[in-house]
Amino acid sequence: MSSQNLNRRDFLKLAGISYGGLLFGNRLDSYLKSSSPQMDEFMPDAEIAITAKEKWVQILSGSQTRVWGYEGQLLSGSGVTVQNLPGNYLGPIIRVKTGMKLRIYFHNELAEDSVIHPHGPRVPEASDGHPMQAIGPGQMKVYEFEIIDRAGPYWFHPHPHMRTAEQVVMGMAGLLSVWDDEEELAVPGASTGLNDIPVIIQDRNFDSTNQFLYNPNNMWGYLGNRILVNGKPNTVFALEPRAYRFRILNGSNARTYKLAWSNNMPMQVIGTDGGLLPAVASRPYVMLMPGERIDIWADFTALARKQVILRSLSFDPMGGMMGGGGGGMGGSGGMGGGGMGGGGMMGSGLPMGSAFDILTVSVGRRAGTKPVLGPLAPLSVIYKAEDFATARPFTLDMSMMTWTINGRVFEMMEVAEDEMVHVHDTMAWEWINNTPIPHPMHMHNVQFQVVQRTVPATSSYATINQGLVDTGWKDTAPVWPGERVKIAMTFGPHAGMYMYHCHILEHEDMTMMRNYMIMDHTMPPMPM
């Protein structure tokens, strides 16, 4: 842990003083120290090593591709599996049960700083992967946390300051699959993943030698012209004529997908970011923005010896707000930025909102066991819009080609007064999208429920509105142009400084990210 503490001290020395209702650096240090766990009291059930390193893998025919990836190893303990994916840049897949305590040793063998963010689960501040916790080449960071959340399709990825987007493009992402007894009763094989089909959808650009080409634009971020599933192109799953569970992650930096089956069978949604829904949500298609996960129950019983394609359908990503409605473009009068027309069509051979195939399911003749979906349990808490007459507003905007939240940009050690909450506070926040493009808004260390959408009066919204699934727990929510999205949540049990941001990774790196502080009675008094 010495590298982590040194990092924190170095950041605090460089932080300086902030003004205008913000926490001063030395007082913020007190908050961070008081929120850190006592590591000598932690007794893990399992210890895992994760190493970030460069390697070469075969993605396209011809030359291999240089990638960065994680490699995992189970060092001690039982009840946890760590599955590496040979010949792939993705992974590992870590499968663990709710209630288990993990100690993870993160080794950085890259030539630049990095840090891992566990995306979805609530963890102590010291293990959340804030950019200030990044470690340098050759260093190690220790993560210690208990899985306190319900079963869900969580994941992990890098989160260094201004380098998250390119590190993810280079290949760094893994799955943290959490199961519990409730899920095991509802979904056959939940504890083992017997019926699971993990699907990580990404898009990439390649140069003439098959190397990843990172060429984002300022508006849309990085849009690739090749679709990869689980790190490979042209994916075909050979499956039996029975039901399977498709656990889909949008692992792209910026691209939104409108998922549908080619035979028009409905998308049967059984879960979202934070686990199972209280009831199956049937949709003609499902919208999936970067960072979001969706859990689909797909029954191929009637499709023996046939093929069905999972596609992304066309949609209008612009919201009818080319001028940035409400000043969202800072008076720039159009998209600007060079090659950023509607859907980024000049910056990518596959514009945002265009239609394309993602993967093919080739159904065989016979099935062995035929799993049957059990009853889904009700949520332990249901928030309702009428219980939250007021909400803290957070306006998403753009000024002079800089993305902002409430007019602010990211500062490493800055927390404003309206970004302070207390452990066990239950409240609503409202995202207000004043920009011409959609944003997937992600919060660290909390699962929330979308309780209200105030929709814009634009024809483009009709191209996506049937694909929203708001009936479960979320950590990332789509906010369409001109839309207001009210979310409700209870903070805790961990106190400390966490983050919220747009999960278009280029937007995050370009300052569309802020800190928020969860305070408790053990912390020093708030600065006046």
Task: Label every PLM stretch briefly.
Residues M1-D10:
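N-terminal secretory signal peptides
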Residues P393-W403, F410-V450, D475-A495, H501:
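C-terminal substrate/ligand-recognition segments
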Residues Q4, A15-G16, L28-W297, M318-D397, ...:
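Histidine-centered copper-binding motifs that mark active-site loops
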Residues E146-R150, D299-R305, T490-A495:
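Short, surface-exposed loop/turn segments at beta-strand-coil junctions that are enriched for proline
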Residues L288, A298, E417-V421:
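Extracellular/surface-associated beta-sandwich interaction domains
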